[in-house]
Amino acid sequence: MKRIRFFDIAKGMAILAVILGHSAIEANLFMPHRTAQIIVSICFSFHMPLFFILSGYFMHPERKFRWAKESKQLLCTYAVTALCVLIGVTCMATLNHESRVLALRQWGMAALYGSGDVSDLTLWPVDFRIGAIWFLLALFWARLLLHFFAKLPYTFIWVIACFLVGYGSSRYVWLPWSIQAGMCAVAFLYLGYLAKKYDVLDFVRRVPYIWINAFLIWIIDIVFFDGMSMAMNSYGPHPILAVVGSIAGTLCVIGISQLFDKVAVLGDTFSRIGQASLAILCAHLIEDDVLLQSWQSYLDMLRTLFPQVPLVLLSFIVRLPIDFAGAALLHYVPKINEWFYPQLAKQHQLNRAGIVHKRAFPLEK
C-alpha cells in the first residue's frame, strides 16, 4: 500500500506528544505547575490510542499472522532497546559509583517483566518499569489477538470481551509482558481496521460538522482528564469518556495532519519524524530510563540557567536532540535498522524482487 503522508504527519505529532508528555511529567514532579498538568492531559489523551488506531488501519487480520515479521519488528526491537538500557544504566552506575550488579538486577527485572509503569499488582516484586516500549509488547499481543478474532464469527463481540477481561483483570493482578495492555489495545486496533474498511475518513470529509463534534468531545476529555494511561489499563474515573475522547482526539490530530500536509515545510518535517517514530520512541525510552535518576538534578540546573523559560519546554528542548540523534544512529546500524525503520525492510524487499526479476528476464527493457 502506498504511504499516506498525512498519517506519517499524525505519527510525527504523536511521537512528539510522547516526549513532551514525559517531559511534562518530570517537570511537574520537580515543581508542580498547572501548565505541565495541562500538557500531560493533552498529550496522554490521544498519543498512544492514535498509534494503535493507525496500526489497525493498515492491518489485514483476515490474512495469516506473520510470526517472523511481527517478532522482528516488535519483539526483537524490544529486546535490542532493553539491552541498550541495561548497558546504559550499567555505565551510569559506574559513573555515579553505585552498584552495577544492583542496577543490572533491577533493570533486568524491569525489562523481563515488560511493564509500562511500576505496579503493586505484579506477580513478583519489580522495582522499576521498562517504560514506553511496553507499546511494542502490547502491540504484538493486540495484533495476534485481532488476527485470531477476525477468523471467528461476531468479531466485534470478541474484541469487546477481550477489552473487558483485560481491563477488569488488571484491577487485581498485573501480568508480565504487557499482556493485559495488549488485550485492551485490541479494541483500538479493531477501530482502525473498521475505519479503513468502511472509509470513515471519506465520510468525515463529506460531513464536516463531525470535525466540530470530535473537537468538542476531545476538549471535554482533556478538561476532565484524570490519569489515562494505556500502559497500565488506567482510564481514570470516566473510562467511557477517556476512550471516546481518545478516538475523537485521534480524529482531530488526523484532521490537523491533513492541513499540515498542504504546507510544504510542516508536511515534510512532521512526515519525516513520523516515519522515524518507532526509532524515536526506542531512543527516547533509552534516554528516559538511563537518565531516570538524574533528570531531577538536570532540571534544577536548567531552571537556574534559564529561569524565564518554562521548565516543561526546557526539558523537551534538551530531550529532543538526544532522541533524534539516537534514532538517526539506529538508521545506520546494518540489519537492525530494518527493525526500527520498517520502510527500509520494505525497500530491501523491493530491491531484491527487482534483482530477481532482472535475472529471470535479462533481456527485458
Functional labels for PLM-detected ranges:
Residues 1-365:
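Alpha-helical transmembrane segments and their immediate juxtamembrane cytosolic regions
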